[in-house]
Swiss-Prot record:
Protein name per UniProt: Tryptophan synthase alpha chain
HAMAP family noted in UniProt: Trp_synth_alpha
Lineage of the species this protein comes from: Bacteria, Pseudomonadati, Pseudomonadota, Gammaproteobacteria, Enterobacterales
Family matches, as SUPFAM superfamilies: Ribulose-phoshate binding barrel (SSF51366)
Annotated Pfam families: Trp_syntA
Organism: Escherichia coli (strain K12)
Listed GO biological process terms: aromatic amino acid family biosynthetic process; L-tryptophan biosynthetic process
Catalytic activity as recorded in UniProt: (1S,2R)-1-C-(indol-3-yl)glycerol 3-phosphate + L-serine = D-glyceraldehyde 3-phosphate + L-tryptophan + H2O
């Protein structure tokens, strides 16, 4: 959890925002997935947002669903994902690692056991995509017991009550949703979210990172100009993996070429 605090403090000092890529663990196989994650970090990622493959990903558009199918095809299990997380943490001791996942995967383990395992391998935050704030108590309590930041999604139409709840319960960062709907690079991030950012700040929420539909450097810059602490990009990155599925080296080179200007756009 503290890794987010030190990251945001360092970025503030350097007058930079955070660039946070999302990928599915184990896509397209364990070995290449670990190389992908190393490449993202080398190219400038400030933190990681990682998915654990799940059979029914409601919030995900087709691009990320395909990533999940590729991981399943490679035989990747949640247990192997945790082994990968431990390896990533060993290799990269300071980078914040967040999980983006679904409640069933938490229930399968038992809520407390799941967060205990997160703590053990060095995961900093968990966003459970299909658990609304009002049902989040058992999740966030277990998270805090194990020093894992509970992350909440702030939708573009959030009312005042919801903003207060998100500010009060969330730690690490706040996931600021560019728009409603499912993930996907083809639907560009829409409206400026200045008013939400201002309210979240007023209520002392964890720093907002804008996600959903972030696929170009100008959108990263726009998110930061609107007051966000950074931006999360998933589908655009996963699409690069898909396009170079049979050319592992080209894939890594293309990921680097994508991430470098995205990170550069965070520097004012």
């Amino acid at each position: 959890m503290e890794r987010y605090e030190s990251l945001f403090a360092q970025l503030k000092e350097r007058k930079e925002g955070a660039f946070v890529p999302f990928v599915t663990l184990g896509d397209p196989g364990i070995e290449q997935s670990l190389k992908i994650i190393d490449t993202l970090i080398e190219a400038g990622a400030d933190a990681l947002e990682l998915g654990i493959p799940f059979s029914d990903p409601l919030a995900d558009g087709p691009t990320i669903q395909n990533a999940t199918l590729r991981a399943f095809a490679a035989g990747v299990t949640p247990a192997q994902c945790f082994e990968m997380l431990a390896l990533i943490r060993q290799k990269h001791p300071t980078i914040p690692i967040g999980l983006l996942m679904y409640a069933n995967l938490v229930f399968n383990k038992g809520i407390d056991e799941f967060y205990a395992q997160c703590e053990k391998v060095g995961v900093d935050s968990v966003l459970v995509a299909d658990v609304p704030v009002e049902e989040s108590a058992p999740f966030r309590q277990a998270a805090l017991r194990h020093n894992v930041a509970p992350i909440f999604i702030c939708p573009p139409n959030a009312d005042d009550d919801l903003l207060r709840q998100i500010a009060s319960y969330g730690r690490g960062y706040t996931y600021l949703l560019s728009r409603a709907g499912v993930t996907g690079a083809e639907n560009r991030a829409a409206l400026p979210l200045n008013h939400l950012v201002a309210k979240l700040k007023e209520y002392n929420a964890a720093p907002p990172l804008q996600g959903f539909g972030i696929s170009a450097p100008d959108q990263v810059k726009a998110a930061i100009d609107a007051g966000a602490a950074g931006a999360i990009s998933g589908s655009a990155i996963v699409k690069i993996i898909e396009q170079h599925i049979n050319e592992p080296e080209k894939m890594l080179a293309a990921l680097k070429v994508f991430v470098q200007p995205m990170k550069a756009a965070t520097r004012s």
